[in-house]
Amino acid sequence: MVQLLGLDSDRPVALDAVGTLLVPAEPVPETYRRHARRFGATLHSREIDLRFQQAYSRIWSPQLSTRTSQEIEKARWRRLVHEVFQGSVRSKDSLFYALWQHYARGEAWRLAEGVEAFIQHLNREQIAWAIASNFDQRLHSVVRSFSALRGARFVFTSAELGVSKPSRVFFKRISEVLSHDSPLMIGDSLSHDIHGALQAGWQAAWITTKLFRPVEHPGLVFQGSLEALVKAVT
């Protein structure tokens, strides 16, 4: 079964971070609301959630360039906070920095269900694994906060690679570091993690708890929850 799923000691594994390994410790709208209250905002979580989703879809539109950097990512998050709280807080920049720093800390996150068991399996089978995320340099401090994640061979972020998923360049640069043409990408985003990896010639495992029609592709070796993947390989 391990061989069938593309998991073997000769093939390195790259795991997405947010949504796959890590999830926010509390709902994002509630975190935003709690921090914004210190700066005079009175928006409810539902309104914040709506504004967040609208701003996020504009700022990280799939039609935009995948080129990125630490400065670009920080500017994008600043713009998002400004748009969400337009006209409702005294100092949007101060709120932005409070939120930016909050999500750089481990307590802002928790491990997703099944992560510890899956990482233990990789370590037991001596399978090299790395983290590959559309994130910025803050991810390093977050990863260090979780003992289960400290065994990652590398932590790749789009901000440091200069390009984000689903660009083939993102995966090519990681392949070069891992010295392997076809690692296994495990992630929850069909467009960024799965399609991006498959188009780059990688294998992929799609982590999802939703009922979708199975994706037909010879490189897609698994589709389901992380807990189901753990059961399949142990």
Question: Residues of each region from the PLM?
Answer:
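Asp-based, Mg2+/Mn2+-dependent phosphohydrolase catalytic module
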Residues: 1-13, 23, 46, 90-94, ...
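N-terminal helical cap/lid subdomain that shapes the substrate entry/recognition surface
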Residues: 2-116, 124
